[in-house]
């Protein structure tokens, strides 16, 4: 498994409870596809440097996780289905050991 980091930007229209539910569902997707979340860093609501989908604010969450490389396309497909997830970026932190 490889070590990845995902940074998620979520809609500012979400309530605190909806925001928590959304990032927990991403956490569950990682686990259901054979991954292991190592760290979750909730940044909360922040002002954006430039508008994203006409929003000037958004909720940020950063997760570090171990994940099988062959499951990455399915994980990204699931992320794209979430309407309140404005943007995400997955970064490879370490090669397979």
UniProtKB/Swiss-Prot annotation:
InterPro entries given in the database record: Ribosomal_bS6, Ribosomal_bS6_sf, Ribosomal_S6_plastid/chlpt, Transl_elong_EF1B/ribsomal_bS6
Q: Which GO terms describe its cellular component?
A: cytoplasm; ribonucleoprotein complex; ribosome
Per the UniProt entry, the signal peptide is none
What Pfam families is this protein classified in? Ribosomal_S6 (PF01250)
The record's similarity note reads: Belongs to the bacterial ribosomal protein bS6 family.
Function description: Binds together with bS18 to 16S ribosomal RNA.
Which protein, by its recorded name, is this? Small ribosomal subunit protein bS6
Organism, scientific name: Dictyoglomus thermophilum (strain ATCC 35947 / DSM 3960 / H-6-12)
